Amino acid sequence: MGSPPCALGLFCCCSSCFCLCCPRHRPVSRLAAVVGGAAAVPAVVSGVTGLILSPSQSPIFIQPTPLPQTLPLRPGLDLAFANQPGHLAPLGEIRPSAPPLPPVADLPQPGLRR
């Protein structure tokens, strides 16, 4: 199974890379913004999102990076986990990070009479 050639006669290989000069891959509804003399082309093709800078009108080829096998932590959580000594506490074990709060006095509820 071959892919149709792009506008410059090159063949698009969607499994490994794609060419933005091809009408099949070119973003239709978005205009290119000019940033410092380079055309910034937003690309959203088969799950790949990015801003591609091209100094000329030559075809742009994008090689998508493979996704890591492990799920990344949320920003900030990696620092929190990195500062912990050792592994997480076993189930049922409590490691308080702050001293316990003092007991709270029993205050009457608003609207109730004693």
Curated annotation (Swiss-Prot):
It is found in: Host endoplasmic reticulum membrane; Host cytoplasm, Host cytoskeleton; Virion; Host cell membrane. Residues 6-22, 33-53 are annotated as: Hydrophobic. Residues 91-114 are annotated as: Disordered. Residues 95-104 are annotated as: Interaction with host SRC, HCK, FYN, PIK3R3 and GRB2. Disulfide bonds: none annotated. It is a lipid-anchor. GO terms for cellular component: host cell endoplasmic reticulum membrane; host cell plasma membrane; host cytoskeleton; membrane; virion component. Residues 28-68 are annotated as: Interaction with host HPX. It comes from the Viruses. A motif (PTAP/PSAP motif) lies at residues 96-99. Residues 72-114 are annotated as: Homodimerization, and interaction with host AMBP/bikunin. The PSAP motif is necessary for the release of membrane-wrapped virions from infected cells. The viral particles present in feces and bile are non-enveloped, while those in circulating blood and culture supernatants are covered with a cellular membrane (quasi-enveloped). Belongs to the hepevirus ORF3 protein family. Forms homooligomers. Interacts with host SRC, HCK, FYN, PIK3R3 and GRB2 (via SH3 domain); binding does not activate the kinases. Interacts with host AMBP/bikunin and AMBP/alpha-1-microglobulin peptides. Interacts with host HPX/hemopexin. Interacts (when phosphorylated) with capsid protein ORF2. Interacts with host TSG101; this interaction plays a role in viral release from the host cell. Interacts with host SIRPA; this interaction down-regulates the phosphorylation of host IRF3. This is Protein ORF3. The lineage of its organism: Viruses, Riboviria, Orthornavirae, Kitrinoviricota, Alsuviricetes.
